[in-house]
Amino acid sequence: MKKIPYCRITCDGNELRYIKEVLDCGWLTTAGKTQELERRFAEMVGARYALAVNSCTAALHLAAEAMGIGRGDRVFVPTMTFTATAEVLRYLGADPVLLDVEYGTNLLTPAILEAAAMRYPEVKAVMMVHYGGQAAQMDTEDGHEGLLEVCHRHGLGVIEDAAHTFPARRNGRTVGSLGDVTCFSFYANKTITTGEGGMLVTNDEAIARRVKVMRLHGINRDIWDRFTAVKPSWEYDVVAPGFKYNMPDLNAAVGLAQLERAEEFRQGRERCARRYLANLTGLPGLDLPVLQVRPEDHAWHIFPIVLRPEASLTRNRCIELLAERGIGTSVHYKPLHRMSYYQQTYELGAERFPNAERTWQGCLSLPLFPTLTDDEVDYVCAAVGDCLKAAVCGSVG
Protein backbone atom coordinates (compact mmCIF):
# COMPACT_ATOMS: atom_id res chain seq x y z
CA MET A 1 0.00 0.00 0.00
CA LYS A 2 1.24 3.46 -0.87
CA LYS A 3 1.69 6.09 1.84
CA ILE A 4 0.78 9.53 0.53
CA PRO A 5 0.79 12.29 3.14
CA TYR A 6 -1.45 15.32 2.83
CA CYS A 7 1.65 17.53 2.64
CA ARG A 8 5.35 16.94 1.97
CA ILE A 9 7.88 19.73 2.46
CA THR A 10 10.63 20.46 -0.10
CA CYS A 11 13.80 21.97 1.40
CA ASP A 12 16.60 20.68 -0.84
CA GLY A 13 17.82 23.96 -2.33
CA ASN A 14 20.01 26.64 -0.75
CA GLU A 15 18.38 26.43 2.69
CA LEU A 16 21.38 24.94 4.52
CA ARG A 17 23.83 27.25 2.76
CA TYR A 18 21.92 30.37 3.77
CA ILE A 19 21.35 29.11 7.31
CA LYS A 20 25.10 28.51 7.64
CA GLU A 21 25.75 32.08 6.50
CA VAL A 22 23.54 33.31 9.33
CA LEU A 23 25.25 31.04 11.88
CA ASP A 24 28.70 32.08 10.66
CA CYS A 25 27.68 35.74 10.92
CA GLY A 26 26.68 35.23 14.55
CA TRP A 27 23.55 37.39 14.30
CA LEU A 28 20.51 35.11 14.42
CA THR A 29 17.61 37.50 14.81
CA THR A 30 16.22 40.14 12.44
CA ALA A 31 18.93 41.61 10.20
CA GLY A 32 20.33 41.36 6.68
CA LYS A 33 18.68 38.13 5.55
CA THR A 34 15.27 39.40 6.64
CA GLN A 35 15.82 42.67 4.81
CA GLU A 36 16.88 40.80 1.67
CA LEU A 37 13.79 38.59 1.85
CA GLU A 38 11.60 41.69 2.19
CA ARG A 39 13.23 43.36 -0.80
CA ARG A 40 12.97 40.34 -3.07
CA PHE A 41 9.40 39.56 -2.04
CA ALA A 42 8.28 43.14 -2.69
CA GLU A 43 9.82 42.97 -6.16
CA MET A 44 8.08 39.68 -6.91
CA VAL A 45 4.57 40.84 -5.99
CA GLY A 46 4.97 44.41 -7.24
CA ALA A 47 4.52 46.20 -3.92
CA ARG A 48 6.45 49.21 -2.61
CA TYR A 49 6.92 47.80 0.88
CA ALA A 50 7.24 44.30 2.33
CA LEU A 51 7.61 43.62 6.04
CA ALA A 52 8.50 40.16 7.32
CA VAL A 53 6.83 38.89 10.49
CA ASN A 54 6.63 35.61 12.39
CA SER A 55 3.22 34.50 11.03
CA CYS A 56 0.41 35.51 8.71
CA THR A 57 -1.70 35.95 11.84
CA ALA A 58 0.78 38.59 13.01
CA ALA A 59 0.58 40.26 9.59
CA LEU A 60 -3.22 40.38 9.74
CA HIS A 61 -3.14 41.81 13.26
CA LEU A 62 -0.60 44.47 12.32
CA ALA A 63 -2.54 45.34 9.17
CA ALA A 64 -5.78 45.88 11.06
CA GLU A 65 -4.03 47.93 13.74
CA ALA A 66 -2.22 50.08 11.18
CA MET A 67 -5.51 50.78 9.39
CA GLY A 68 -7.01 52.12 12.59
CA ILE A 69 -9.42 49.28 13.29
CA GLY A 70 -10.29 49.29 16.97
CA ARG A 71 -12.85 48.80 19.69
CA GLY A 72 -16.42 48.86 18.45
CA ASP A 73 -15.52 48.69 14.76
CA ARG A 74 -17.07 46.04 12.53
CA VAL A 75 -15.29 44.25 9.70
CA PHE A 76 -16.61 41.85 7.04
CA VAL A 77 -15.02 38.37 7.11
CA PRO A 78 -15.96 35.36 4.94
CA THR A 79 -17.08 32.46 7.08
CA MET A 80 -15.02 29.97 5.04
CA THR A 81 -11.61 30.85 6.40
CA PHE A 82 -9.16 29.96 9.15
CA THR A 83 -9.95 31.50 12.52
CA ALA A 84 -6.93 33.85 12.39
CA THR A 85 -8.71 36.05 9.84
CA ALA A 86 -11.38 36.92 12.39
CA GLU A 87 -9.57 36.47 15.69
CA VAL A 88 -7.13 39.32 15.05
CA LEU A 89 -10.10 41.69 14.99
CA ARG A 90 -11.08 40.53 18.46
CA TYR A 91 -7.56 41.36 19.68
CA LEU A 92 -8.36 44.98 18.79
CA GLY A 93 -11.88 44.96 20.23
CA ALA A 94 -13.48 44.92 16.78
CA ASP A 95 -16.24 42.56 15.68
CA PRO A 96 -16.22 40.32 12.59
CA VAL A 97 -19.38 40.36 10.50
CA LEU A 98 -19.39 36.94 8.88
CA LEU A 99 -20.49 36.59 5.25
CA ASP A 100 -21.42 33.65 3.08
CA VAL A 101 -19.25 32.84 0.06
CA GLU A 102 -19.78 31.71 -3.51
CA TYR A 103 -20.24 27.96 -3.89
CA GLY A 104 -17.46 26.31 -5.86
CA THR A 105 -14.85 29.02 -5.26
CA ASN A 106 -15.41 29.81 -1.57
CA LEU A 107 -14.67 33.45 -2.40
CA LEU A 108 -16.47 36.66 -1.63
CA THR A 109 -18.02 38.13 -4.76
CA PRO A 110 -18.87 41.75 -5.61
CA ALA A 111 -22.58 40.88 -5.37
CA ILE A 112 -22.22 39.33 -1.91
CA LEU A 113 -20.16 42.26 -0.66
CA GLU A 114 -22.49 44.87 -2.18
CA ALA A 115 -25.52 43.33 -0.47
CA ALA A 116 -23.67 43.17 2.85
CA ALA A 117 -22.43 46.75 2.60
CA MET A 118 -25.98 47.95 1.95
CA ARG A 119 -27.28 46.00 4.93
CA TYR A 120 -24.45 46.99 7.29
CA PRO A 121 -23.41 50.53 6.31
CA GLU A 122 -21.51 50.99 9.57
CA VAL A 123 -18.90 48.34 8.70
CA LYS A 124 -15.41 49.81 8.36
CA ALA A 125 -13.39 47.29 6.35
CA VAL A 126 -13.30 43.83 4.79
CA MET A 127 -10.93 40.90 5.23
CA MET A 128 -10.70 39.69 1.64
CA VAL A 129 -9.70 36.02 1.68
CA HIS A 130 -8.19 34.55 -1.49
CA TYR A 131 -9.21 30.94 -0.97
CA GLY A 132 -7.26 27.87 -1.95
CA GLY A 133 -4.77 29.68 -4.17
CA GLN A 134 -7.30 31.47 -6.40
CA ALA A 135 -7.50 35.25 -6.27
CA ALA A 136 -10.89 36.86 -5.77
CA GLN A 137 -12.26 39.25 -8.40
CA MET A 138 -10.71 42.49 -7.21
CA ASP A 139 -10.93 44.43 -10.51
CA THR A 140 -13.63 44.97 -13.13
CA GLU A 141 -14.04 41.90 -15.38
CA ASP A 142 -16.16 41.69 -18.53
CA GLY A 143 -17.85 44.96 -17.63
CA HIS A 144 -18.76 43.79 -14.12
CA GLU A 145 -17.31 45.78 -11.25
CA GLY A 146 -14.86 44.12 -8.90
CA LEU A 147 -14.58 43.96 -5.15
CA LEU A 148 -12.36 47.03 -4.96
CA GLU A 149 -14.98 49.17 -6.69
CA VAL A 150 -17.57 48.02 -4.15
CA CYS A 151 -15.18 48.81 -1.32
CA HIS A 152 -14.36 52.26 -2.64
CA ARG A 153 -18.04 53.12 -3.12
CA HIS A 154 -18.88 52.14 0.45
CA GLY A 155 -15.71 53.47 2.06
CA LEU A 156 -14.45 50.04 3.12
CA GLY A 157 -10.79 49.47 3.91
CA VAL A 158 -9.32 46.34 2.31
CA ILE A 159 -7.07 43.81 4.02
CA GLU A 160 -6.27 40.89 1.73
CA ASP A 161 -5.69 37.55 3.44
CA ALA A 162 -3.49 35.82 0.88
CA ALA A 163 -2.26 33.02 3.15
CA HIS A 164 -3.19 30.55 0.40
CA THR A 165 -2.29 32.63 -2.60
CA PHE A 166 1.38 33.06 -3.43
CA PRO A 167 2.43 33.33 -6.14
CA ALA A 168 -0.82 34.09 -7.95
CA ARG A 169 -2.34 36.49 -10.46
CA ARG A 170 -5.71 37.47 -11.84
CA ASN A 171 -6.19 39.37 -15.08
CA GLY A 172 -2.51 40.19 -15.18
CA ARG A 173 -2.45 41.65 -11.67
CA THR A 174 -0.31 39.99 -9.02
CA VAL A 175 -1.89 39.26 -5.65
CA GLY A 176 -0.28 41.76 -3.31
CA SER A 177 -0.28 44.72 -5.68
CA LEU A 178 -3.87 45.96 -5.33
CA GLY A 179 -5.43 46.37 -1.87
CA ASP A 180 -4.50 48.63 1.03
CA VAL A 181 -2.46 45.80 2.54
CA THR A 182 -1.96 42.10 1.77
CA CYS A 183 -0.85 39.37 4.17
CA PHE A 184 0.93 36.16 3.18
CA SER A 185 1.76 32.97 5.07
CA PHE A 186 5.03 31.03 5.11
CA TYR A 187 3.67 28.24 7.31
CA ALA A 188 5.11 24.77 6.74
CA ASN A 189 2.50 23.60 4.21
CA LYS A 190 2.47 26.73 2.05
CA THR A 191 4.03 27.13 -1.41
CA ILE A 192 7.13 28.56 0.23
CA THR A 193 7.92 28.21 3.91
CA THR A 194 10.08 29.67 6.65
CA GLY A 195 8.80 27.08 9.13
CA GLU A 196 6.71 29.76 10.78
CA GLY A 197 6.46 33.18 9.21
CA GLY A 198 4.54 35.67 7.16
CA MET A 199 4.84 38.82 5.07
CA LEU A 200 2.81 42.02 4.95
CA VAL A 201 2.97 44.08 1.76
CA THR A 202 1.54 47.50 1.04
CA ASN A 203 1.93 50.50 -1.25
CA ASP A 204 0.97 52.87 1.58
CA GLU A 205 3.99 54.47 3.24
CA ALA A 206 2.09 55.35 6.43
CA ILE A 207 0.93 51.76 6.91
CA ALA A 208 4.46 50.46 6.27
CA ARG A 209 5.95 52.86 8.83
CA ARG A 210 3.39 51.88 11.46
CA VAL A 211 3.83 48.14 10.90
CA LYS A 212 7.62 48.42 11.01
CA VAL A 213 7.43 50.00 14.46
CA MET A 214 4.61 47.90 15.87
CA ARG A 215 6.07 44.52 14.87
CA LEU A 216 8.85 45.01 17.45
CA HIS A 217 7.47 46.48 20.67
CA GLY A 218 6.63 49.89 19.22
CA ILE A 219 10.34 50.78 19.18
CA ASN A 220 11.34 53.41 16.65
CA ARG A 221 14.67 51.78 15.70
CA ASP A 222 15.31 48.39 14.09
CA ILE A 223 17.26 46.01 16.29
CA TRP A 224 19.92 45.64 13.55
CA ASP A 225 20.35 49.41 13.43
CA ARG A 226 20.55 49.67 17.21
CA PHE A 227 23.51 47.31 17.38
CA THR A 228 25.40 48.35 14.23
CA ALA A 229 25.02 52.14 14.13
CA VAL A 230 27.27 54.64 15.89
CA LYS A 231 24.31 55.82 17.96
CA PRO A 232 24.09 53.82 21.23
CA SER A 233 21.82 50.76 21.11
CA TRP A 234 19.90 51.88 24.18
CA GLU A 235 19.00 55.22 22.65
CA TYR A 236 15.54 54.60 21.23
CA ASP A 237 11.94 55.57 21.87
CA VAL A 238 8.80 53.50 22.38
CA VAL A 239 6.07 55.29 20.45
CA ALA A 240 3.27 52.78 21.17
CA PRO A 241 2.75 49.46 23.00
CA GLY A 242 3.74 47.15 20.16
CA PHE A 243 4.14 43.42 19.67
CA LYS A 244 6.89 40.79 19.30
CA TYR A 245 6.21 39.85 15.68
CA ASN A 246 9.61 40.16 13.97
CA MET A 247 11.08 37.40 11.78
CA PRO A 248 14.56 36.10 12.75
CA ASP A 249 17.26 35.82 10.10
CA LEU A 250 17.37 32.04 10.55
CA ASN A 251 13.80 31.85 9.28
CA ALA A 252 14.45 34.41 6.56
CA ALA A 253 17.41 32.34 5.33
CA VAL A 254 15.06 29.44 4.67
CA GLY A 255 12.60 31.84 3.06
CA LEU A 256 15.19 33.21 0.64
CA ALA A 257 16.05 29.72 -0.57
CA GLN A 258 12.36 28.90 -0.95
CA LEU A 259 11.60 32.17 -2.75
CA GLU A 260 14.18 31.30 -5.41
CA ARG A 261 12.00 28.30 -6.30
CA ALA A 262 8.53 29.75 -5.72
CA GLU A 263 7.43 29.47 -9.35
CA GLU A 264 8.95 25.99 -9.65
CA PHE A 265 6.94 24.90 -6.61
CA ARG A 266 3.79 26.55 -7.97
CA GLN A 267 4.21 24.77 -11.30
CA GLY A 268 4.60 21.45 -9.51
CA ARG A 269 1.34 22.04 -7.70
CA GLU A 270 -0.34 23.08 -10.95
CA ARG A 271 0.80 19.87 -12.65
CA CYS A 272 -0.84 17.81 -9.90
CA ALA A 273 -4.01 19.91 -9.92
CA ARG A 274 -4.42 19.57 -13.68
CA ARG A 275 -4.10 15.79 -13.33
CA TYR A 276 -6.68 15.74 -10.52
CA LEU A 277 -9.07 17.73 -12.70
CA ALA A 278 -8.56 15.42 -15.67
CA ASN A 279 -9.01 12.25 -13.61
CA LEU A 280 -11.90 13.32 -11.38
CA THR A 281 -14.06 15.29 -13.81
CA GLY A 282 -17.34 13.52 -14.41
CA LEU A 283 -17.36 11.33 -11.31
CA PRO A 284 -20.96 11.20 -10.03
CA GLY A 285 -21.74 13.05 -6.82
CA LEU A 286 -18.46 14.98 -6.82
CA ASP A 287 -17.90 18.73 -7.23
CA LEU A 288 -14.45 20.00 -8.16
CA PRO A 289 -12.99 23.50 -7.66
CA VAL A 290 -14.52 26.13 -9.94
CA LEU A 291 -11.75 28.00 -11.75
CA GLN A 292 -12.10 31.71 -12.47
CA VAL A 293 -8.44 32.18 -13.38
CA ARG A 294 -6.09 30.39 -15.74
CA PRO A 295 -4.45 27.35 -14.09
CA GLU A 296 -1.06 29.02 -14.55
CA ASP A 297 -2.27 32.04 -12.52
CA HIS A 298 -3.49 29.87 -9.62
CA ALA A 299 -1.26 29.18 -6.59
CA TRP A 300 -2.89 25.76 -5.99
CA HIS A 301 -2.36 25.76 -2.26
CA ILE A 302 -5.05 23.10 -1.84
CA PHE A 303 -7.20 20.87 -4.02
CA PRO A 304 -10.64 20.81 -2.34
CA ILE A 305 -13.46 18.54 -3.47
CA VAL A 306 -17.07 18.40 -2.28
CA LEU A 307 -19.14 15.23 -1.98
CA ARG A 308 -22.73 16.01 -2.91
CA PRO A 309 -25.60 14.36 -0.97
CA GLU A 310 -26.40 12.08 -3.90
CA ALA A 311 -22.94 10.52 -3.57
CA SER A 312 -24.35 8.51 -0.62
CA LEU A 313 -20.95 8.92 1.02
CA THR A 314 -20.26 11.20 3.95
CA ARG A 315 -17.15 13.33 4.03
CA ASN A 316 -15.94 11.73 7.27
CA ARG A 317 -16.40 8.21 5.93
CA CYS A 318 -14.55 9.14 2.74
CA ILE A 319 -11.65 10.45 4.82
CA GLU A 320 -11.59 7.16 6.77
CA LEU A 321 -11.60 5.08 3.59
CA LEU A 322 -8.79 7.12 2.03
CA ALA A 323 -6.77 6.82 5.24
CA GLU A 324 -7.15 3.03 5.04
CA ARG A 325 -5.38 3.29 1.68
CA GLY A 326 -2.58 5.41 3.14
CA ILE A 327 -3.87 8.74 1.80
CA GLY A 328 -3.75 11.84 3.98
CA THR A 329 -6.45 14.50 3.68
CA SER A 330 -7.59 17.70 5.35
CA VAL A 331 -10.71 19.90 5.51
CA HIS A 332 -10.85 23.58 4.49
CA TYR A 333 -12.80 24.62 6.44
CA LYS A 334 -15.26 24.12 9.19
CA PRO A 335 -16.90 27.54 8.75
CA LEU A 336 -16.40 30.13 11.47
CA HIS A 337 -20.14 30.38 12.09
CA ARG A 338 -20.00 26.75 13.28
CA MET A 339 -17.23 27.41 15.81
CA SER A 340 -18.58 27.68 19.36
CA TYR A 341 -16.91 31.01 20.12
CA TYR A 342 -18.44 32.78 17.13
CA GLN A 343 -21.78 31.01 17.52
CA GLN A 344 -22.11 32.04 21.15
CA THR A 345 -20.68 35.54 20.82
CA TYR A 346 -22.66 36.56 17.74
CA GLU A 347 -25.68 34.22 17.85
CA LEU A 348 -25.10 32.94 14.33
CA GLY A 349 -27.44 30.54 12.57
CA ALA A 350 -26.47 28.20 9.75
CA GLU A 351 -29.37 29.46 7.60
CA ARG A 352 -27.45 32.69 6.96
CA PHE A 353 -24.68 30.79 5.18
CA PRO A 354 -26.26 28.35 2.70
CA ASN A 355 -23.28 28.10 0.35
CA ALA A 356 -20.75 27.59 3.15
CA GLU A 357 -23.05 25.01 4.72
CA ARG A 358 -23.37 23.16 1.43
CA THR A 359 -19.59 23.09 1.09
CA TRP A 360 -18.91 22.18 4.72
CA GLN A 361 -21.17 19.12 4.64
CA GLY A 362 -19.04 17.39 2.03
CA CYS A 363 -15.66 19.11 1.66
CA LEU A 364 -12.22 17.57 1.94
CA SER A 365 -8.83 18.45 0.51
CA LEU A 366 -6.67 15.92 -1.32
CA PRO A 367 -2.86 15.72 -1.13
CA LEU A 368 -1.17 18.50 -3.08
CA PHE A 369 2.51 19.39 -3.08
CA PRO A 370 5.14 19.88 -5.80
CA THR A 371 6.88 16.51 -5.37
CA LEU A 372 3.62 14.54 -5.59
CA THR A 373 4.12 12.21 -8.55
CA ASP A 374 1.69 11.52 -11.37
CA ASP A 375 1.42 7.92 -10.14
CA GLU A 376 0.51 9.15 -6.66
CA VAL A 377 -2.15 11.50 -8.05
CA ASP A 378 -3.57 8.62 -10.08
CA TYR A 379 -3.60 6.42 -6.97
CA VAL A 380 -5.52 9.06 -5.01
CA CYS A 381 -8.00 9.54 -7.86
CA ALA A 382 -8.58 5.80 -8.18
CA ALA A 383 -9.21 5.59 -4.45
CA VAL A 384 -11.73 8.44 -4.58
CA GLY A 385 -13.47 6.77 -7.51
CA ASP A 386 -13.59 3.44 -5.69
CA CYS A 387 -15.11 5.10 -2.63
CA LEU A 388 -17.84 6.69 -4.73
CA LYS A 389 -18.59 3.47 -6.61
CA ALA A 390 -18.76 1.46 -3.39
CA ALA A 391 -21.14 4.03 -1.89
CA VAL A 392 -23.46 3.75 -4.88
CA CYS A 393 -23.45 -0.03 -4.46
CA GLY A 394 -24.33 0.42 -0.80
CA SER A 395 -21.19 -1.17 0.65
CA VAL A 396 -19.99 2.00 2.43
CA GLY A 397 -21.63 5.11 3.83
Put a short name on every predicted segment:
Residues 27-74, 88-92, 98-100, 173:
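Phosphate-binding glycine-rich loop
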Residues 34-39, 47-50, 57, 111, ...:
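PLP-dependent aminotransferase class I/II
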Residues 42, 89, 149-151, 280-281, ...:
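A generic structural signal for well-ordered alpha-helical segments
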Residues 61-119, 125-127:
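Conserved PLP-anchoring active-site segment centered on the Schiff-base-forming lysine
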Residues 92, 153-154, 325:
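Helix C-cap/helix->beta junction micro-motif
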Residues 104-194, 199-207, 314, 369:
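Active-site phosphate-binding strand-loop segment of PLP-dependent enzymes
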